[in-house]
């Protein structure tokens, strides 16, 4: 007969329950979370016309336990977010794009803002910033083509340039003119990074002057230097350009490892996007069995991004009728999948990437109600 366990050796009941519970996730302050989201994809990478970042903010302090991901924030999706107790909605498309003159119950977009604030839910939108990043929507879409290498169609530039200004001016001056010229240049607004270095020009000791300036200041600098022909004829003007960011930008030009038929590509895209149907326009002189080696793609609406690109295939969500005609006339086949169908599938990959980026501090869920408004009847 086994001996009874002394009461003091039994673990307390509350400790047993604690050991059985899943780990409790830490909350994140909204502004801390927004900063982390901006680190994941800088809003500076978004197109200039876009409206990205934190769009709706409940009064602080606001903590986030559940981040809710959706492609489009409709009223049905908002109701789902409320029911699932979301604290922040990340909506790929910005629900506020055109400025609101009032916030009432009259229009559906106004109602989204009202419901968000009533339920203390923030709204954040990354949109074209996620199009540009190397681990973003367009790179996800390339996976539907099969094995390939890709590069941005329109590379992004660095958000800011440390040098300042738009132009660099360089000239050489002798000791007789140097001090007077430098004094006048320093009086010109928007002149940056003025430096001097010893230089030897045609056997004479001179000083090489270098400065950065704005477009407006450039006119004044040139006017000043033109007063002295010796200085002016030794002047060089360079247009400063921001460096390109590797693997970052709008659209992708993909080169497949092996050419495959258009028919096979259609099957791959349908499988990747989990769609029963897509729309196809076969390029002039091509057939469904024609080989595809190069494909240009752009998630969403790709007309402006794809236009003029040499490829065997354009892949996007939607294009205008006339842009499709133009592509087909140039022997380029077109696959259209409807706008958001080329974006929505990325959300599952995004959920996993953000979980790692945010160190699993919060719950991240993907909407089950979000869907493309267009269906094949």
Cite the ranges covered by each PLM segment.
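Hydrophobic structural segments
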Residues: 2-377
């Amino acid at each position: 007969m086994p001996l009874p366990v002394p009461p003091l050796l039994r673990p307390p009941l509350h400790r047993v329950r604690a050991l059985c519970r899943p780990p409790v996730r830490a909350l994140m302050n909204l502004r801390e979370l927004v900063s982390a989201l901006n680190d994941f994809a800088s809003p500076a990478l978004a197109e200039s016309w876009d409206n990205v970042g934190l769009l709706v903010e409940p009064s602080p302090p606001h903590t986030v336990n559940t981040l809710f991901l959706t492609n489009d924030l409709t009223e049905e999706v908002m109701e789902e977010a409320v029911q699932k107790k979301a604290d922040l909605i990340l909506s790929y498309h910005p629900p506020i794009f055109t400025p609101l003159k009032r916030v009432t119950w009259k229009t559906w977009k106004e109602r989204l803002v009202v419901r968000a604030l009533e339920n203390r839910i923030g709204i954040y939108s990354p949109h074209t910033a996620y199009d540009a990043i190397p681990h973003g929507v367009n790179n996800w879409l390339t996976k539907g083509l099969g094995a390939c290498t890709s590069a941005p169609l329109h590379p992004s530039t660095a958000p800011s340039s440390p040098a300042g200004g738009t132009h660099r001016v360089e000239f050489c001056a002798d000791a007789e003119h140097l001090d007077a010229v430098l004094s006048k240049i320093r009086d010109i607004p928007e002149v940056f990074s003025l430096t001097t270095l010893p230089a030897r020009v045609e056997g004479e000791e001179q000083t090489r002057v270098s400065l950065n300036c704005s477009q407006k200041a450039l006119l004044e600098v040139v006017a000043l230097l033109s007063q002295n022909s010796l200085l002016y004829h030794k002047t060089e003007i360079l247009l400063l350009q921001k460096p390109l960011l590797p693997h970052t930008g709008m659209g992708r030009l993909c080169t497949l490892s092996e050419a495959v038929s258009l028919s096979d590509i259609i099957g791959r895209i349908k499988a990747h996007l989990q769609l029963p149907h897509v729309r196809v326009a076969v390029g002039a002189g091509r057939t469904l069995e024609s080989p595809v080696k190069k494909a240009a793609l752009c998630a969403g609406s790709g007309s402006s991004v794809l236009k003029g690109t040499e490829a065997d295939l354009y892949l996007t969500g939607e294009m205008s009728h006339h842009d499709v005609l133009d592509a087909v006339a140039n022997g380029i086949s077109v696959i259209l999948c409807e706008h958001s169908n080329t974006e929505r599938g990325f959300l599952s990959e995004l959920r996993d990437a953000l979980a790692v980026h945010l160190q699993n501090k919060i719950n991240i869920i993907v909407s089950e109600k979000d869907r493309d408004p267009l269906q094949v009847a």
